A protein has these predicted regions:
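FIC/Doc superfamily catalytic core
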Residues: 1-127
Length: 127
C-alpha cells in the first residue's frame, strides 16, 4: 500500500491549535527529535510490512516517549495517530476517555507499541 505520511507542518499546526485551546507552551524542544519521530513509521514500512495500526502506533510511541515538544507531547501523539488514520482511510472510534487512558499508558510505559497497535486495530474503522 502507498501510505500517506503525517506532514511535519500539519502536525505543528494541530499541536499549536491544541495548545491554544487547552493551554501550554507551544515551542519545539528538539526539532531533530520531531524529525526522527516522523521518520519512524516510514523506516518501519521500508524494512517490514506493517499494517495501518502498527504505523499509527509508531507515531504515537515516538511522540509520547521522545518529547520533541515543550508541552503537549501526549496530545500530539494522539493527534498524529488520528491524523495518520484519517489520511489513510481510517478513523478512531474510541471515546476521548479511552483514548486518553491509552495514551497515558503508552507514555507511562504501561502499554507497549505492539499493545497500542492492537488497541488501534480494535478502536478504528474505515471512514
Amino acid at each position: 500500500m502507498a501510505w500517506v505520511w503525517v506532514d511535519k507542518g500539519m502536525l505543528l499546526l494541530l499541536h499549536d491549535e491544541s495548545l491554544a485551546e487547552h493551554g501550554g507552551d507551544s515551542r519545539l524542544r528538539d526539532e531533530g527529535l520531531l524529525d526522527s519521530v516522523l521518520m519512524r513509521p516510514e523506516n518501519l514500512a521500508a524494512y517490514e510490512q506493517p499494517d495501518f495500526a502498527a504505523l499509527a502506533a509508531s507515531y504515537c510511541v515516538g511522540l509520547a516517549k521522545n518529547h520533541p515538544f515543550v508541552d503537549g507531547n501526549k496530545r500530539a501523539a494522539l493527534l498524529a495517530t488520528g491524523l495518520f488514520l484519517l489520511l489513510n482511510g481510517k478513523k478512531l472510534t474510541a471515546s476521548q476517555a479511552d483514548a486518553t487512558l491509552a495514551i497515558l499508558g503508552v507514555a507511562g510505559s504501561e502499554i507497549s507499541e505492539l499493545e497500542f497497535a492492537a488497541w488501534v486495530r480494535r478502536n478504528s474503522k474505515d471512514r
